[in-house]
Amino acid sequence: SVTNRGGLPEYPAPGQFKGSQDQLLRNNGDGSFVSITIEAGLARPSRGLGVMAGDLDGDGVLDLYVANDGEPNQAWIGDGSAGFHDAAMEMGLAINIFGQAEAGMGIAHGDVDGDGLEDLIVTHLISESDTLYRNLGQGHFEDVTGARGLAHPTIDFTGFGTLLFDGDNDGDLDLVTSHGRVLRGSTHAMAAGSSHWQPYAEEDHLFLNDGQGRFRIDAKSGFATRVGVSRGLAGGDLDNDGDIDLVITEADGSLRWWKNQSEPSSWWLLNVIDPSSNRTDLGAVVEFHDGDKLQRRSVGGGGSYLSGSDQRVHLATRNEGERSLKVRWSDGTSESFQVPPHRTISTLRKGQGE
């Protein structure tokens, strides 16, 4: 058993147990799955908590990124035939700017600075800030956490679920993170839940993007008024009104639905479908140009912590520039589509573009 200085039992730290290998399961197409972990090259024990799929090196092939608890993260680069190798260290995604492995929990992914490249954010344990890895292109990333305003506001919190989404419908990606300790601390004056969980309670955070990839805490939304032990976090337009709502789970409490009450002027929800399977084309990328501003949104990919978000692509803008819409499908082909009428839910089907 593990106890703190006061003799009270605590949850064991990751260094006190062995990790196990992650699993890659292939869908047999009949409702069953088979493990291809060993033949895919993924049979390496670790303490994985967060995972996402996306094209990390820009070669058109899906890769896997794993946030590990207390050891270097893994960037499994795909070879296009279900084989992978870990390139996290050379890509700049394994450790932070100080050369330290951190207690990785959840992952958020998206283009935070509008340069057309998908960046990564990983949440961590208290005393470790969340880490923002900026995509430099050609498979290289750098830790820009401090420069983008995330170091100081996150270092005193334990982050789990996280999501990059356009919370205020201005065309750039904002950041939300759910918090809850794993070690007892001083009890927050507004802590909810039972007496057992109150010393673990923390406020969640919503950060607004200034359009250049720098973040500040939103103090006006009332989002931080709930203080609990948050874990899972997912986003989606639950009421189909054109903005992204949030769902958060707690270790000791009911599920919470945060209804987005912003009033977007122009918005779109896009289902991105491959008719050959009649399914969402996971790994596809939607590029929306509005004047000189680019919104790049990937389809699906996972992330956060033990959560799955709405797979529809959400676009919003306050601009009135010339607009264009393009989809790069997961097989590497591309099509242009007419921009649907704004304030609508539409479907983009492969083969029906230009």
Q: At which residue positions do the language-model features occur?
A:
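Short, conserved, GDST-rich strand-edge loop motifs in beta-rich repeat architectures
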Residues: 1-17, 178-199
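Short, solvent-exposed loop/turn segments at conserved positions within beta-propeller repeat blades
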Residues: 13-20, 70-71, 125-128, 194-202, ...
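Repeat-based blade/solenoid architectures
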Residues: 18, 39-52, 93-108, 149-163, ...
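Beta-propeller blade signature
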Residues: 20-28, 77, 134, 202-210
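Beta-propeller blade termini
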Residues: 26, 49-58, 62, 77, ...
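Blade-edge beta-strand/turn elements of extracellular beta-propeller
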Residues: 31-42, 83-97, 139-152, 213-223
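Hydrophobic beta-strand segments that make up the repeating blades of beta-propeller
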Residues: 59, 63-68, 115, 119-124, ...
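Gly/Ser/Thr/Pro-enriched helix-cap/hinge segments flanking short amphipathic alpha-helices
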Residues: 199-202, 209-354
